[in-house]
Amino acid sequence: YKEEDFSNIVIQSSDNFNAMGLDLYRLLASSDALITDYSSVFYDFMLMNRPIAFTVDDYEEYKDGRGFAVEDPDYYRAGPKIQTIEDLFSFITQVSNGKDEWQEKREKVNLEVNYYRDFKNCKRALKIGGVEL
């Protein structure tokens, strides 16, 4: 892999987004794929059924420290785990070539974690809170 082949990749942090007044979800909507850590944003991105990869460089530290919200986080992370620069370049190359080995698993997990996909979740949340429209 040559670094110049990936010159169009931009790495951003939450602080950068906030400082520039950007909306993460608008960016996600126009993204072909997502590379993330343990943030729950991938559950939202999964609704678009696009490739997701996960960085796992501090897995043990995170597990032993803050911990995960689910017992088996790897079950829900339907995408490759990036541990090396080669893994990163491989994922980007696969996305660029339209290859998606994780689509079936992602669809299965999406059905579990995003049960309602009818755009009425706000209405349901208000009803649970005792607010009727």
Stretches found by the model and what they are:
Residues N18, T36, A78-G79, Y116:
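Short N-terminal micro-motifs specific to bacterial/archaeal maturation
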Residues Y1-E4, R106, F119-C122:
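Short secondary-structure boundary segments
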Residues E4-V10, S40-V113:
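Catalytic binding pocket for nucleotide-activated donors in carbohydrate/polymer assembly enzymes
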Residues D23, P80, R117, N121:
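Soluble or luminal CAZymes and related metallo-dependent hydrolases
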Residues Y1-Y43:
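Donor nucleotide-activated moiety binding/catalytic core segment of transferases
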Residues R117-L133:
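C-terminal alpha-helical cap of glycosyltransferases
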